[in-house]
């Protein structure tokens, strides 16, 4: 017979989808090298932008989906944003109807791919070769996922490699929402592509590239994650390791309350991202982390002063790390369920 813990975990996974069954989102704005560019509403009218417009705010489902590279029906954009090696690129995520991003569970990852043989405003990207420049998961000490900062209204900033060769590139920034990630096929992928033109005298080229689809599997431990609601469990990022172009002090996280975090990954590479809310915060130094997983997958942790939730226990009343968008009604349902389980 299944344990009470497994029943509660299943209920958590099922209930996590209920309050936002139709609430998804997209990248609504990017700031590249200080210049702001608005994105187009999915399926809406089209204005000049370097962000490739998608047809729906719904997530891409299935790691083998043909739209994994830039999102559903992603269209070539008319603009190419000017950037330099080491430029900062800030992404604003929005939910449907102008609401905040609705999810708070799962990693953020960023890739780049050269627009081979042409400019990005003419490049279809189906055959693009991608290299990873950033990945971030949970905060330090069993805290929240960094995605919580995006749900709180924050933005996310990555730093482009400082030695990257000049040319046109796509920046593929994605959120993988794992509120249903306890079941195979439950992960929701939200990829977004922004077109940039990098100048300068850099000569760096990536030593490893991947394709989308192809870089992930629905059974990868960081995509099908039975411990997604256990903050004490290590997380294994899907996809390739960070590119050889990424190095140095580059991992910070700023939250709504001005908290900061950073992470250092295996091989000395560090994520380049910064999640920023309404209150600016400084940059903290990378910290060593450990974890387990596939070769090439990098565990990460951060240092954010967000309020942490207690780890699940199986003694006494069941406790669980509820997604923050759980309503009182759903929590009451779970409590009633727990009472019933203990009566068995």
Swiss-Prot record:
InterPro entries: AA9 (IPR049892), AA9_LPMO (IPR005103). Pfam families: AA9 (PF03443). Glycans are attached at residues 201, 207, 317. Residues 311-320 have a biased composition (Polar residues). Disulfide bonds join 70-193. Its cofactor is Cu(2+). GO terms for cellular component: extracellular region. Its EC number is 1.14.99.56. Cu(2+) binds at residues 24, 190. It comes from the Eukaryota. CDD domains: LPMO_AA9 (cd21175). Residues 259-292 have a biased composition (Low complexity). Transmembrane segments: none annotated. O2 binds at residue 179. Keywords: Carbohydrate metabolism, Cellulose degradation, Copper, Disulfide bond, Glycoprotein, Metal-binding, Monooxygenase, Oxidoreductase, Polysaccharide degradation, Secreted, Signal. It is found in: Secreted. Gene3D superfamilies: 2.70.50.70. It catalyses: [(1->4)-beta-D-glucosyl]n+m + reduced acceptor + O2 = 4-dehydro-beta-D-glucosyl-[(1->4)-beta-D-glucosyl]n-1 + [(1->4)-beta-D-glucosyl]m + acceptor + H2O. Residues 240-321 are annotated as: Disordered. PANTHER family: ENDO-BETA-1,4-GLUCANASE D, PUTATIVE (AFU_ORTHOLOGUE AFUA_1G12560)-RELATED. Lytic polysaccharide monooxygenase (LPMO) that depolymerizes crystalline and amorphous polysaccharides via the oxidation of scissile alpha- or beta-(1-4)-glycosidic bonds, yielding C1 or C4 oxidation products. Catalysis by LPMOs requires the reduction of the active-site copper from Cu(II) to Cu(I) by a reducing agent and H(2)O(2) or O(2) as a cosubstrate. This is AA9 family lytic polysaccharide monooxygenase D. It comes from Gloeophyllum trabeum (strain ATCC 11539 / FP-39264 / Madison 617) (Brown rot fungus). The gene is LPMO9D.
